[in-house]
A protein has these predicted regions:
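Cys/His-rich Zn2+-binding cysteine-cluster or related metal-binding knuckle/ribbon modules and their
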Residues: 196-198, 223-234
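Catalytic alpha/large subunits of respiratory electron-transfer oxidoreductases
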Residues: 158, 164-165, 170, 228-536, ...
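N-terminal leader/propeptide and maturation segments of large enzyme subunits in energy/redox metabolism
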Residues: 120-142, 555-583
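Ferredoxin-type iron-sulfur electron-transfer modules and their immediate structural context
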Residues: 1-12, 17-214, 218-221, 244-276, ...
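Short, amphipathic alpha-helical "lid/cap" segments that border enzyme active or binding sites
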Residues: 28-35, 39, 313, 317, ...
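Glycine/threonine-rich phosphate-binding loop and adjacent beta-strand/alpha-helix elements that clamp
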Residues: 2-13, 535-554
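Amphipathic alpha-helical
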Residues: 209-227, 337-340, 347
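A general boundary/transition motif marking the beginning of the first structured unit of a protein
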Residues: 93-97, 304, 557
Length: 583
């Protein structure tokens, strides 16, 4: 019964064949048991029953749980399902239950307190208790009951599930730097929390979520602003983050087309391992905010009003036909596919792609545009790192991990932050730094001035070759440079920018911007929705030449609408208007 093995050769059987006439549900259940046993037999050669997963519960029955545990929640009575009148039900075959209205259904769903532990499928404690056949009845005794901390907008702390392993404490102190967690109290009352039991919001917490990743149980979990976690199955996909130039590999979890969680893959970790910054782990939630641009907006008397995609297409067709000059601008925040789409439009009017001069830097000509498979291997080739100015959180963590191997870290003009406590040396002037041929110089192009960057390049060139690592806050900086946009801009009658408000848009007769978010003060006449890195299948080049991919886990159709618009404007060929063309 526990394996469906018949004892005859390698034959497993269930359902009606084994039971006789029975229900389909029983047959399906037998099939699942047999499938699990067959898989184990093929893997190990043993025929054994599946272990019953260990489940930790507050009590054996609901009646044993004290109502005081839920005193912090407002008690809302359950709504009764509207039903067909009895007299009518007797003489008809209509559905008796009429169903809730949308408002009532949403209200009823909000009554749910919790859906159990959100890491029950990955919890190490549960796994070990299952493997060793732990019986919780043998470990009776007193229990600590701690209130669950919901004060942080993105991190939930449930001390009741903590096993005091100290992983979060060490990671926060030794890898990330803030050291905001620690053991408080002693003995049985010991608790892992910030000093004096305060909220994480009252500490120097970076909100990077690294403590969540290293927690082996459910004591630390993510919290989403617009979606309630639940234990239902999720669609998993791997892609790269698109919020800066580091290009971290991320794992997205989706339910019904809605992103519910962004984390790192346990099975296929990228160069960033389990490391993500605040933006990478939680920043995606901004794409579900109220200021997200989802429909075209036309400015009328200084106020933006919603219009349809067709109306927006007709408006662009009318305005561009009235102008004598056109300009199409790209930005390093968009994918290569989006740049190529706009290039088709520029080609239509025999003009070249343009870009705001603010995206240009003196070092652009020195940056390699060649794709790299393992770009951050460069960190392994040096023994000392000189960091000028502030860096992206993940890149700083990668450098810290190298430092823990015995390498030297020197900071120059780094703003006050927890990362500073790891520095072996700290300087205010780059010329004071003592270096060797094994020194790598690192800076973020967006976080220091052009003058400071120039001084660093001159200083580094005196010490050796290929010893500079340039990072940016741009999603697709090398890809942007590879398109060779024109930075010498003049006033045009019609201007359109993708991922940026067009340069000198106020002086144009008509201006359009394809953007991700609304802005009531946008200096353009028409706003068109743009897909985020989670809403299209695309490609980009990260700062060091890594080819990054987007997989559209949100199942968005914004890029489809844009390609339809470009096709109707005769900017692209019919073949180009099909998604497979770009895959």
């Amino acid at each position: 019964e526990s394996t469906m093995f018949t004892g005859l050769g390698n034959v497993f059987a269930g359902g009606d064949f084994r039971r006789g006439a029975a229900t389909a549900i029983e047959a399906i259940a037998d099939g699942r048991i047999a499938a699990t046993a067959i898989d184990r037999f093929l893997e190990t050669g043993e025929i054994a029953a599946e272990l019953i997963p260990f489940d930790s519960k507050k009590a054996n029955t609901v009646k044993e749980i004290s109502p005081e545990e839920y005193s912090i929640y407002e008690k809302i009575e359950r709504r009764e399902m509207p039903e067909l009148p009895v007299e009518e039900a007797k003489i008809s075959f209509k559905e008796v239950e009429l169903g809730f209205s949308e408002t009532d259904a949403v209200s009823e769903a909000k009554r749910c307190l919790e859906c159990g532990c959100f890491v029950n499928e990955t919890c190490f404690l549960r796994k070990y208790c299952t493997d060793y056949l732990v019986n919780p009845a043998q470990f009776l005794g007193d229990k600590n009951k701690h209130p669950i901390d919901y004060t942080h907008p993105f991190i939930v702390r449930d001390a009741n599930k903590c096993i005091y392993c100290g992983r979060c404490i060490r990671t926060c102190a030794e890898i990330q730097g803030p050291a905001v967690l620690g053991y408080i109290y002693r003995g049985f009352a010991t608790l892992v929390a910030p000093e004096f039991g305060d909220s994480l919001t009252k500490t120097s917490c970076l909100s990077c979520g690294k403590c969540i990743d290293v927690c082996p149980v459910g004591a630390l979990t993510e919290r989403t602003v617009h979606y309630k976690f639940n234990p239902h199955l999720k669609d998993i996909s791997l892609q790269n983050c698109g919020l800066c130039g580091v290009g971290c590999l991320i794992q997205t979890e989706t339910q019904a087309g809605t992103i519910t969680r962004v984390t790192t893959s346990q099975k296929e970790p990228g160069f960033n391992g389990k490391n993500l910054c605040f933006k990478g782990r939680f920043g995606w939630q901004s794409f579900y905010d109220k200021d997200r641009l989802t429909v075209p907006l036309k400015k009328e008397k200084g106020i933006f009003k919603e219009i349809s995609w067709q109306e927006a297409t007709d408006l662009i067709a009318e305005k561009i036909s009235l102008g004598n000059s056109q300009r199409f601008e790209i930005s390093p925040y968009i994918s290569l596919e989006e740049m190529l789409l706009l290039k088709r439009a520029a080609d239509k009017y025999t003009t070249v792609l343009s870009a705001n001069p603010a995206f240009s830097a003196f070092s652009d000509s020195c940056i390699s545009l060649r794709p790299q498979k393992e770009p951050y291997r460069i960190l392994d080739n040096f023994q000392e790192y000189v960091v000028y100015g502030e860096l992206n959180q993940v890149l700083a963590t990668l450098i810290r991990l190298q430092q823990r191997k015995g390498k030297k870290l020197t900071l120059v003009n780094y703003p006050e932050s927890p990362f500073c406590r790891f520095a072996d040396a700290n300087y205010a002037n780059i010329k004071e730094v003592q270096t060797t041929e094994k020194t790598l110089f690192i800076y973020n192009q967006n976080r220091i001035s052009e003058q400071e960057a120039y001084e660093l390049w001159c200083f580094a060139s005196e010490k050796g070759k290929d010893n500079l690592l340039v990072s940016t806050d741009y999603h697709n900086h090398p890809g942007f440079l590879a398109m060779q946009p024109n930075f010498s801009l003049t006033v045009s009658d019609f201007v359109l920018g993708w991922g940026v408000y067009p340069f000198l848009s106020a002086e144009a007769k008509f201006s359009v911007a394809i953007m991700t978010f609304k802005d009531e003060k946008a200096p353009v006449d028409l706003l068109i929705p743009a897909p985020s890195y989670l809403e299209m299948e695309g490609t980009a080049l990260s700062d060091l030449g890594q080819v990054t991919k987007s997989a559209n886990p949100a199942k968005s159709i914004i890029i489809n609408e844009l390609m339809r618009m470009f096709y109707c404007l005769k900017w692209i060929h019919p073949n180009s208007a099909e998604i497979p063309f770009w895959n």
